[in-house]
């Protein structure tokens, strides 16, 4: 009985899909074995794993393959074979097996099982397999004539082998196992060949006799030739076996039979199958296939053949692998990164991203808010424009309503006196608006000269052909006398009139240049410095008699008092309307620091003063000086209260020495600049007034420059009787005022009250935040600088203020004398700058004046003394006293100049000599390294150079920061050769004295 194992290939099942309908093909080998070529019937068993058992084979080392040998190469000791002979009849397989070739289908069923048989198409059989089948048939036929020789004379069968089988393989196997043969040497067992086809390993059990080897079926000898002759395609595997098996005489233990199969998948390689005959080999074999003869009933002659078909090796697959090289950070020299730090960094990144998103949202919200604010601002601006337009409309309506209610206007003139000839009147605008109900007829001097003195403004165009004498303001007041004097209906307009109070003036003789008429017929006084020569007279020369047309005692003053009260009522009514109509504006005006609030208070105070003055003059005793200096009133147009106050504040600027220049300490051109003396007066005492004064300078026109310097001083002392102002003005800087008149210059009650309030809190003056104290200090500062720090300031008024303040406290007197404005200038600075040495003397006599006080530019009163003009011996004596009490070597913070340098630069030889006498350092240098001598050389003043070189301490070799000396500066100009000679002589004299 035989057992056959077959292993199917995956590709074989694809090629053979249709089972054969005829009996399978089988091949009988020369050794008597019947090979079944139909392997498909074992596929099911092979797939289930029930029939295959792997046999461990101990293989030797691989031998060299000789792939270049020819396919018909024979084993050694095998001679040429004769043509094919009939196969031996002594070989008969125990179980006949038939091999089916692809295209030939037979109905004979295999003896073992009914497995389906696969057929292959003709196109799928390779040419190489046909050649192998033909070669196997040819070798079997050629081996038949030599069967007898091989059977009895040779112990080695002739085997078919693949082209890669080495020729020395059988010799080596025979030499290794020589003791296994019992008679003649048996053919050695060949090692398995490593091929690429299928390998059939057959293990033959030992036989007790050789009779089984000689019995064979004639079917095997004729089967293969029939297949070749019929042209059938070769099967999938070809079993190459010899047609003889050597039959030695004595019994042998085993025989080796080599069977080589070639797989259909690889046409170029072959595997070898080793068939071993062993007498009782314990080598396990695959489980036998079902057979009609049990294994235990097998005779010795029966040989079991195990055939297993090894599938071809899988195709070579190319694996692509990514090879990574692991390198540690330590080997690269890098710092090891802590995984915790990485996680923390990730957390930080996420936190930052969240914060960024939050900030982005906030930014978007801010942008939205900004857009909303911009829209709100635009809406507010639009609202403000609408309100301004509404205010303008309301003002226009208010003026129109007042114009409709107005039936007439009256120009009021107060305390006028008859004059002989033309008068040049200069006035101070008090800014009082008068709206009088009634009718007046405008009459000129030629019409009713003896009855009234009014000059009606709108009728001025009708009087252009009158004489100059007829255009003079008349001194008599005319009152309404009935409805017959009402003006025509064409003259209905609302005009504001001003009470322009003239403090002093000069008289002009008759002539066309005595006065000028305004566009509306008003008379304007010309500047007191501009009238022609020979026409100027003092007011004391005016006659003191009354006008013939004016009664000695008239009710004019009482009537004016009534009008003043009416003006007060109208102002109060106007304020009430402002509060009700525009409460926000009214609240802003009511602030203590508001300029409008100050103007309102001053206006009311002026009205009170006017009322009290005219009430006191109702029945006064006649005094020629008082009557001569009583302020006549002129009429001037105004458009608003603010413009009136501008005229009031700056109306004095054209008076006095209009062309004389003095200092304003603003740090320009060495710390000072030359401006009009009036610009440095008391209006600069507070920062609030400074901003207004700067704006008012732009509004200053030619109509505002007609008032004298003393007018505003008289206004500052609101409680001073008006008759004394002119007397103070007429007195010169060095003149003494009679004691009886000086007593009449008293500070205002507001000033005295502020002094009392401030004297109780002197330590808190510099740091106080109390609004009342600050207001008191502001009041004192304004009035003090108006009285003491102007070009027109009167020593008598200053003495009166100092006398009134001294009883309060000596400390308060020191505070008042050294009070500084926002530029750091004191009354002493201003008095020296204006050359008011009488006031300087008064300030020095107090004993509390700080002479070395520096302003913001770093200048003291001593430093600016060389710039003043001391015209008299008394003035020069004050200068010497000032220089002795102060430090003459103080340098300014701006530029480092000294008093001596300022005197030299302004060519003040007398002041330079006084400074040198008061121990002034002649060698001090400014920030540029220049000395007083260098400045004198630069200006080319030979006398000053000679005076400086005469000083024993003078050093002519000093150099400035540019490396220049006084001599090099003098040599730059060809006109300074005399100075260069003086410098050379001084240098030679110094060298000679040094030797």
From Swiss-Prot:
ANK repeats lie at residues 823-853, 862-890, 895-924, 928-958, 962-992. GO terms for cellular component: cytoplasm; cytoskeleton; cytosol; microtubule cytoskeleton. Residues 680-693 have a biased composition (Acidic residues). GO terms for biological process: negative regulation of actin filament polymerization. Residues 1-29, 68-127, 443-467, 503-558, 617-642, 663-705, 721-740 are annotated as: Disordered. This is KN motif and ankyrin repeat domain-containing protein 4. Keywords: ANK repeat, Coiled coil, Cytoplasm, Repeat. Residues 526-549, 694-705 have a biased composition (Basic and acidic residues).
